[in-house]
Amino acid sequence: MRASPHCLLALTAACCNAPALAAPGDPIALADGVTLDPILALKVRYETVEEDRPLEPADALTARVQAGFELASGAFSLLVEGEATTELTDNFNNTIPGNGRTGFSVVADPENLELNRAQIAWRDGASSVTLGRQRIILDDARFVGNVVWRQNEQTYDAVRGQTAIGPVRLDATYASAVQTVFGADSPNFRFSGDLVFLNAGVKLPRGEVTGFAYLLDFDTRLNASSNTFGAKAAFRLPVGPVTLNAKATLATQSDTGGNPVGYTARYLQGDLGATWADFLLGAGVEQLGSDGGRAGFQTPLATLFAFNGWADLFLRTPDAGLTDTFARAGKKFAVKGLGTVDLLAVYHRFDSDFGSQRYGDEIDLSAGLAVGRASFLARFASYRADGFAVDTRKFWLQTEIAF
């Protein structure tokens, strides 16, 4: 179902026409122990894409509204949220078949109108159970996330249970379907199957150790069916005015279900960083391995934009695998009377895991400003090809406000 600016306005009005006397974003008391919490978020983004191949540059201006409510009484709650995305320009390929725009580069933000979340939940202290269409983000979203960067959010039809016993936390989910970022008009919008997410962690004085198992058996997305088992550790160590950070992850993945390719591949990640007086420095290596060039380690449910470069050249791991060697530097500072500025620069070198192939390198730059509930963001990514894909440049301007 396609959205329009009128859909956006209707959703916004429905959320904002709540009883008065409550500040934006504050729960509204309806009765003794019963509250209504309006949900409203608006994101407007301008994105350009230039590729060194015979395609017209993409020039996309899109807007997204998420609007709804959460009704709570005691330990129980009901949450309903709609999502509408509209295209304010059409000079880009939105990935929808038959759109007549295949001569443009891709910006995967099609017009869309959908029920984004519809869930009931029970919570008692550190324990909770959530049933329905919901947002799921596990750890840093490297394996399971909501793809928050794109306009259409990725959500799951699932039952999820969480609890904590002292320093130990447990998280288990069974999902029967995932709604992707491609919108309701796309054949790639919804994938059903038997999806199991198991995640458990132990908090330590200076960090946390986590074990996980992600079992993905899709009904039709067969080449994404896999079993992944792994562990990760993250630690922080203050040394005078400097805080040192270290992260490491090890995982193994193999085919399952109807996957037509039999393979086993490993995942390795190591990251060292330091912060001092709002300065950030860090470097690391992430390797999505290959099984002899037959297939690479895949993370089909991840928030992929956050990893392996913002130019999105590696949303699917090549069959020869991927080794991403990266370094980053950043700085946060407050501007009096304005807000908090966040600057970040990242360099990536990309190589294969199998076959000693160079893929290229990339520079990513970001500048953000947070002002109360609003945020403003400018980003730039420049990928320089070396035997893989083509030179690609992307630029974004974005503003967002949420209540």
Can you name each region flagged by the protein language model?
Residues 1-32:
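Cleavable N-terminal export/targeting peptides
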Residues 21-133, 159-164, 233-246, 250-251, ...:
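Beta-barrel outer-membrane channel/assembly domains of diderm bacteria
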Residues 45-51, 87-89, 136-147, 175-184, ...:
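Sequence/structural signature of outer-membrane beta-barrel proteins
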Residues 61-183, 194-208, 268, 272-304:
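Outer membrane beta-barrel
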Residues 93-108, 245-346:
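Extracellular/periplasmic loop regions
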Residues 177-183, 207, 215-220, 242-270, ...:
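Outer-membrane beta-barrel translocator/channel fold
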Residues 192-222, 228-235, 306-317, 324, ...:
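Outer membrane beta-barrel transmembrane domains
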